Amino acid sequence: MSDLHLTRGGCPIWETNTMEHFNRSIDVIRGMKDIDAIVVTGDISNDGSEWTYKYADRLFSSLGIPTFCCPGNHDSLKVMLEEYNPSFFKVLPQSCIIDGWNLILLNSVIQDDEDPNQNKARGFLSEASLNYMIQKLEEGFPSIIALHHPPLEPGGWLNRKLLDNRDDFNKIISLYDNVKLVIYGHIHYFTNVLKGHVRYCSSSSVGFAFDKDLPKFQIADGYEGINLIEIINDSITINNIQLSFRSN
């Protein structure tokens, strides 16, 4: 899942109750069987408040499913990675082996030069992050890479504020046949593309969805959702599950 955009006290944003949407996603997952892990590709919070991380941590804990999170541009790196110590979900730096697959989480967030408490909308993977990824890929396990910013253009007006050094990222992973899947968020839109030996997939937002074919920043009501990723041997199947919220 991605882009929860929780706010302190559950205050609506974009005329949307994102907390209600997150609660719904938790209920949907609770009804599933045999879930090995939950991966959140950024923007747990919309305002960076500790309240939002505590709330997410409590609901993820109620599921009892291992949960891994990387930051998004709306998250507070200071709160998420330094000040708040979640009791359940795991944050960067992090990689883990899940049933023989290596899950590698990366930080693509760029802090604002003028205000370190704010982040830029576009993304960038530091040399340290790329080297960390290479180190983990050298271990040879079939691998899933998770980050917030898209390394591929999704089309339409969503072709903006992507991963700045996506060419470098894509060139590196093209050299490693064990990279099977790259998952990300930020665009609030579901995509599923096979490029060479790598499948690229973005998750529609839990908070509020967009659509490349709609006007810029128009909410795509009813398309909020999560992705169910099923891996059997080397076969990867991804289903986008909509949370079924629509305006009256």
Where are these regions (language model features)?
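Acidic/histidine-rich helix-loop elements
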Residues: S2-E20, N46, L77-K90, Q111-L125, ...
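Short, electropositive alpha-helical surface patch
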Residues: W51-P66, W157-K171, V198-V206
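Active-site metal-binding loops of divalent metal-dependent hydrolases
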Residues: S2-H5, G42-I44, N73-H74, S108-V109, ...
